[in-house]
């Protein structure tokens, strides 16, 4: 929204009276099982600003959890959606198909890693994409088992909860979960380095550790797929050691195991590449299947599985689909989103944001030992907070910092298995001045805590 002034403004306490009134209505109408990070109700948003119903303007360093990468209500998306809504809103691609779905599949086949023939299928959410990727892998290999990793998050359906590592709030009380799911150790350089310096820097060694666990737990002969986030999202923006992912991919290829890259949070320029797999090795990583969602359509519900044609074509006709998957309005938004990323130089913009944010945070880390680690890529940067003089996770400090930042008009998110990580996911359209102001506020609050 170009007309929305790009400056922070607080005219009430956070949350203000109008948001508080809506919070009471929410409590009477919405299941209490739905959590809320910051109880301000949004009136409009654009660029790097979210304006609430009280007229407060908050600096957005969350992008709706990495969704509005190109900014809320991006002009090309608004125009494309308006045009599509006026033409038709739904027919179901499985009943009477339409060009938009095909065009999105063509674009995904073009921009995802890998030069060979590819195919795509569209769904609504990241969890649907991951679940269907597992279906496709099982169909292709004829094998049942799936391996996920420590700290992983893959969704809230039954199967993707089984793949997810963290119990609260995602899994507790919702079992039993899908069988034939196994877990392997991730390369986590900061935490690995506390035990073994070699593990922190040698990705091949960390991969050998994981493969050893996989061989003992399940064995390649029973394994359909390995599912991994190239940079973990909810787990804490963990960037594995160099060589870890290529070694796993090589093992998968040698053992007829499908390598599934969950790029739901990392995809579409977020990490300073169109996809995070591109950062791995001299030529990038070419997964067998790649799952995308979040940033794909600037906030409209859309997800996809894209991959090698021979794998994607393995399921029988009618085995994949869904009533709303690849909705025409969401497809129009996705095409406009991809065009915006490519034409507006947003991949380079993510790299600029990385330099600005990491420079600021590492400078603070040098004088504050409660910052255990600063990590991430592009506009996907995390701060791991620990108790002073130790490496013990400090979830309490993290919560206090987030709460105080919200009260000061800055939207930040927390994550991690131990709840001790601040994650920064600004829209790529945020200006340097606004981004710097948000960082100033967060850093000043941390210094005072």
Swiss-Prot record:
GO terms for cellular component: cytosol; plasma membrane. CDD domains: OAT_like. It is an enzyme of class 2 (transferase). PROSITE patterns: AA_TRANSFER_CLASS_3 (PS00600). Its EC number is 2.6.1.19, 2.6.1.22. GO terms for molecular function: (S)-3-amino-2-methylpropionate transaminase activity; 4-aminobutyrate:2-oxoglutarate transaminase activity; pyridoxal phosphate binding. It catalyses: 4-aminobutanoate + 2-oxoglutarate = succinate semialdehyde + L-glutamate; (S)-3-amino-2-methylpropanoate + 2-oxoglutarate = 2-methyl-3-oxopropanoate + L-glutamate. It holds the Pfam family Aminotran_3. It comes from the Bacteria. GO terms for biological process: gamma-aminobutyric acid catabolic process. InterPro entries: 4NH2But_aminotransferase_bac, Aminotrans_3, Aminotrans_3_PPA_site, Class-III_PLP-dep_AT, PyrdxlP-dep_Trfase, PyrdxlP-dep_Trfase_major, PyrdxlP-dep_Trfase_small. Pathway: Amino-acid degradation; 4-aminobutanoate degradation. Disulfide bonds: none annotated. Keywords: Aminotransferase, Pyridoxal phosphate, Transferase. Its cofactor is pyridoxal 5'-phosphate. The modification N6-(pyridoxal phosphate)lysine is found at residue 294. Belongs to the class-III pyridoxal-phosphate-dependent aminotransferase family. PANTHER family: AMINOTRANSFERASE CLASS III. This is 4-aminobutyrate aminotransferase. The lineage of its organism: Bacteria, Bacillati, Actinomycetota, Actinomycetes, Mycobacteriales.
